[in-house]
UniProtKB/Swiss-Prot annotation:
This is Mediator of RNA polymerase II transcription subunit 31. One of its GO terms (molecular function) is transcription coregulator activity. The gene is Med31. It is found in: Nucleus. Belongs to the Mediator complex subunit 31 family. Component of the Mediator complex, which is composed of MED1, MED4, MED6, MED7, MED8, MED9, MED10, MED11, MED12, MED13, MED13L, MED14, MED15, MED16, MED17, MED18, MED19, MED20, MED21, MED22, MED23, MED24, MED25, MED26, MED27, MED29, MED30, MED31, CCNC, CDK8 and CDC2L6/CDK11. The MED12, MED13, CCNC and CDK8 subunits form a distinct module termed the CDK8 module. Mediator containing the CDK8 module is less active than Mediator lacking this module in supporting transcriptional activation.
Length: 131
């Protein structure tokens, strides 16, 4: 009986840890949040830097599939470099990253729409050729 209760407690604890780490990793996609962390000295704390290294497991497909903001993995990778962490103290650096993300999303959206249109046209041609 006690073993079953302990197992349920472990499962609940693991689920909570998963949710908290998922939320935190996704916050790393926000350059303004990274600037906030840098200005408050989090990136100078060796334990915090080690935690960022630990979080690299989110790059594995079995975990990455839960991410809504995959660019957070790129930021997590960049945060492994001390030079990048130091640059984030500068608000202009965060602003630049933010602008680059917006440009990427705009370009990606347009490119994706064109690709979907081309695939739909190709499928329509294949359907009419098959009749």
């Amino acid at each position: 009986m006690a073993a079953a209760v302990a197992m349920e407690t472990d499962d609940a604890g693991n689920r909570l840890r998963f949710q908290l780490e998922l939320e935190f990793v996704q916050c790393l996609a926000n350059p303004n949040y990274l600037n906030f962390l840098a200005q408050r000295g989090y990136f100078k704390d060796k334990a915090f830097v080690n935690y960022l290294k630990y979080l690299l497991y989110w790059k594995e497909p079995e975990y990455a599939k839960y991410l809504k903001y995959p660019q957070c993995l790129h930021m997590l990778e960049l945060l492994q470099y001390e030079h990048f962490r130091k640059e984030l103290v500068n608000a202009q650096c965060a602003k630049f990253i933010d602008e680059q993300q917006i440009l990427h999303w705009q370009h990606y959206s347009r490119k994706r729409v064109r690709l979907q249109q081309a695939l739909a046209e190709q499928q329509q041609q294949n359907n009419t050729a098959g009749k």
